[in-house]
């Protein structure tokens, strides 16, 4: 990846030299830049010197993200050189032909990246044939925290594919399809038309199950065409690579035939770019042996009948064995030496070997070459001439086969554009066959897509969890959010009851719908969202010196600053990393902020153990309470995993602790303590707090929607006027230190007793 920072803009060029993919875009903020880094996960970044002064945390890139970052000399980033480099490489007359009219920084980044690759790869980069500009507004934005929390492509703990969304969806048969599907998962669409095109093709494949299964059968033997053609163009492909390539090409005609059965705009587009490459397949089948060696210098690469000279030299090599056998028989008969043998080694070539018992019968025209303990080795003029013929033909044959192989490889490389287009078409059909298969096997439904902001999921299921559980049944749940009276759902209930799973499943269903996939639900009507944010769990970031609470607050700050009214927020246990009062205050204020359409107004699922937040239902029109249903059996509980309307009145923390195996002595003591604390419950106080920041009987402040977010304390439960007056009356100048200490102790006790 190359990043160029010029005039508050970042030009970003990204390539994968193994496949020839080359992308370019521009962004105008550090946050958007980080989103692109998360999208592509580059291993190396080159940049201009001003990038180091742009405010981006480059040390974080190197240490946390594991990216090698280095600045290039300024001459790499000249305007004239950039234009010249791109026009020359892509063989066009103007940048307009590349679609780069609006990408000034992107042009410089792309050209600098090409120049860098010329120098480091030491080749012409002939597999990079297309530069694809894209707008970040074309895709849903998912930041690194949300990608991690939703476990899109790997699990949070084990960093494994199994247990991720990609693991569920990926039933692709080719490496190209697997890469493309991953990019779909990481880059959901926000264009309704494009989403519906994908849905149409998946529906078509579901309706034609026989066609779908036949496509899978023919896709299976196809090797990684994108990387094979890269090796071919870089002249590193060996004979076995060419056979793998040929075997892959043989699968293309039946796939093309099956594609004729599919309807729709996307299917038509795939067919148009699908070249069966029959001429290349015929060339390889006629020229390369079916089981060639790995090395191009080992010979036996070219098929008999492809080249007359190869056939002649190969016959000479084959006939040479007969010639040697005839010579051996003739010399035995002439000399009477019955155990005479013609042998070969790399030092002496061919020679006649005679044991010591017959050496007296050796004729004068035998020339001794080597004496052994039990034998003598000789050559003759006739054997030497025969050796020159045989070995010379073998050397010439190996060299000729190598030259012919290179010519064939170059012919294939000249067709790189056709091959890459077909490889992309194969990858696309592989992805949609996989998504159709998963939809059918897992009983997914085709979601409706709307632009009105309504998210209505009936019988939704978590796509990963339902595949991981073995001896239990996954309980489905409904979700309803819109841009009006159902903007925020506050979800309460005990730990382990399923709040986090429910919220994640809702986010994943929305994301899957915008991929174009079917979704795990009875029915779904999904309003397109521009971003998904998740704040689920937190841990210390010791490397940067941040506590759990600071990590949490950083994530919340990022969400509140970057979310829009069209975003979906998944917020779990906001404020739990600090004291109860501070945490509740922050959570309350966050809900108020999100609910205000003039400030944010995003659709939100908000899980909390602060039951006091349920008082916001009725105070804020857009807030609704939901909880996880629990069945009590004495001191025990059963999690029903069902989301129901209303707020939970208990956290069941002690019961969960009991399930976890906490000693009974601790459980009993906890029950005693909770009973004492319940007497000082603040819930009744919270009921009297208005979202306008006023308590009963006090002067009304301006409404939140009208002015600002200024709030009174949620916990105005202690009347301290008498203590304040007593402090005013204290005559400090006439008190001894001991008197002052006693007075302080007395006032402190009064305050403690009131709490």
Regions found by a protein language model. Give the residues of each.
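Charged catalytic and DNA/RNA-contacting regions of genome-maintenance
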Residues: 1-204, 220-233, 237-329, 694-705, ...
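Short hinge/gating elements
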Residues: 23, 91-102, 151-155, 165-169, ...
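Conserved catalytic alpha/beta cores of large enzymes that bind or transform nucleotide phosphates
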Residues: 42-51, 56-59, 71, 382-415, ...
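Amphipathic heptad-repeat alpha-helical coiled-coil/stalk segments that mediate oligomerization
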Residues: 77-85, 92, 141, 247-322, ...
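ATPase nucleotide-binding head domains, primarily ABC-like/P-loop NTPase cores
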Residues: 103, 173-174, 184, 355-383, ...
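Short amphipathic alpha-helical segments with heptad-repeat character
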Residues: 182, 314, 384-387, 391-398, ...
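Charged, surface-exposed helical/loop "interaction arms" that form contiguous linear patches used
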Residues: 234, 238, 248-251, 304-305, ...
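C-terminal tails and terminal domains of large nucleic-acid-associated
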Residues: 713-755
């Amino acid at each position: 990846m190359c990043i160029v920072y010029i005039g508050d803009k970042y030009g970003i060029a990204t390539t994968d030299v193994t496949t020839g993919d080359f992308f370019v875009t521009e962004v105008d903020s550090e946050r958007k830049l980080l989103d692109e880094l998360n999208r592509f996960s580059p291993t190396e970044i080159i940049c201009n010197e001003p990038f180091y002064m742009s405010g981006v945390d480059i040390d974080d890139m190197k240490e946390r993200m594991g990216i090698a970052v280095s600045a290039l000399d300024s001459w790499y980033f000249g305007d004239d050189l950039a234009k010249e480099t791109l026009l020359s490489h892509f063989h066009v007359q103007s940048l307009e032909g590349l679609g780069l009219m609006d990408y000034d920084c992107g042009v410089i980044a792309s050209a600098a990246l090409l120049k860098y690759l010329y120098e480091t790869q030491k080749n012409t980069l002939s597999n990079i044939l297309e530069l694809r500009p894209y707008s970040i507004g074309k895709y849903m934005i998912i930041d690194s925290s949300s990608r991690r929390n939703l476990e899109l492509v790997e699990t949070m703990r084990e960093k494994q594919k199994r247990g991720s969304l990609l693991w569920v969806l990926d039933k692709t048969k080719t490496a190209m399809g697997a890469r493309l599907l991953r990019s779909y998962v990481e880059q959901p669409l926000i264009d309704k038309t494009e989403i519906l095109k994908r849905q149409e093709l998946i529906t078509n494949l579901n309706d034609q199950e026989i066609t779908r299964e036949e496509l899978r059968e023919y896709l299976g033997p196809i090797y990684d065409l994108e990387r094979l053609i890269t090796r071919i163009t870089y002249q590193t492909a060996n004979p076995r690579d060419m056979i793998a390539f040929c075997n892959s090409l043989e699968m293309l005609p039946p796939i093309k035939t099956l594609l004729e059965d599919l309807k729709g705009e996307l299917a038509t587009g795939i067919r148009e770019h699908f070249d069966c490459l029959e001429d290349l397949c015929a060339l390889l089948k006629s020229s390369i042996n079916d089981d060639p060696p790995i090395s191009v210098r080992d010979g036996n690469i070219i098929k008999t009948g492809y080249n007359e000279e190869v056939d002649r030299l190969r016959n000479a090599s084959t006939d040479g064995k007969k010639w040697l056998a005839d010579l051996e028989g003739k010399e035995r008969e002439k000399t009477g030496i019955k155990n005479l043998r013609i042998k070969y080694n790399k030092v002496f070539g061919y020679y006649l070997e005679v044991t010591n018992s017959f050496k007296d019968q050796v004729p004068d025209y035998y020339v001794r070459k080597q004496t052994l303990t039990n034998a003598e080795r000789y050559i003759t003029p006739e054997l030497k001439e025969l050796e020159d013929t045989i070995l010379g033909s073998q050397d010439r044959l190996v060299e000729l086969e190598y030259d012919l192989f290179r010519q064939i490889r170059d012919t294939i490389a000249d067709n790189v554009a056709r091959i890459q287009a077909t490889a992309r078409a194969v990858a696309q059909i592989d992805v949609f066959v996989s998504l159709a298969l998963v939809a059918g096997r897992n009983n997914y439904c085709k979601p409706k897509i709307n632009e009105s902001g309504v998210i209505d999921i009936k019988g939704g299921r978590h796509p990963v969890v339902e595949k991981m559980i073995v001896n239990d049944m996954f309980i489905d749940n409904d979700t309803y959010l819109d841009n009006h009276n159902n903007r925020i759902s506050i979800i309460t209930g005990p730990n382990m009851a399923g709040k986090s799973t429910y919220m994640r499943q809702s986010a994943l269903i929305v994301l899957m719908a915008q991929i174009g996939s079917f979704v795990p639900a009875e029915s779904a009507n999904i309003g397109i969202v521009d971003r998904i944010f998740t704040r689920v769990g937190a841990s210390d970031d010791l490397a940067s010196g941040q506590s759990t609470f600071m990590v949490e607050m950083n994530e919340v700050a990022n969400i509140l600053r970057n979310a829009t009214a069209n975003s979906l927020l998944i917020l779990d246990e906001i404020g739990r990393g600090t004291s109860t009062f501070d945490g509740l205050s922050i959570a309350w204020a966050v809900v108020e902020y999100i609910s205000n359409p003039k400030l944010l107004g995003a659709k939100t699922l908000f899980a909390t153990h602060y039951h006091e937040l349920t008082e916001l239902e009725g105070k804020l029109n857009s807030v609704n309470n939901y909880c996880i249903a629990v069945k009590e059996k004495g001191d025990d509980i059963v999690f029903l995993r069902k989301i129901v309307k209303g707020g939970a009145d208990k956290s069941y923390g002690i019961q969960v602790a009991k399930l976890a195996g906490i000693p009974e002595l601790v459980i009993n003591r906890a029950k005693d303590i909770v009973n004492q604390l319940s007497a000082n419950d603040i819930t009744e106080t919270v009921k009297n707090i208005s979202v306008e920041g006023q308590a009963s009987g006090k002067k009304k402040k301006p409404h939140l929607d009208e002015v600002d977010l200024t709030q009174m304390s949620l916990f105005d439960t202690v009347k301290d006027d008498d203590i304040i007056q007593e402090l005013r009356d204290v005559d400090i100048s006439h008190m001894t230190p001991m008197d002052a200490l006693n007075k302080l102790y007395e006032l402190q006790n009064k305050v403690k007793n009131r709490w």
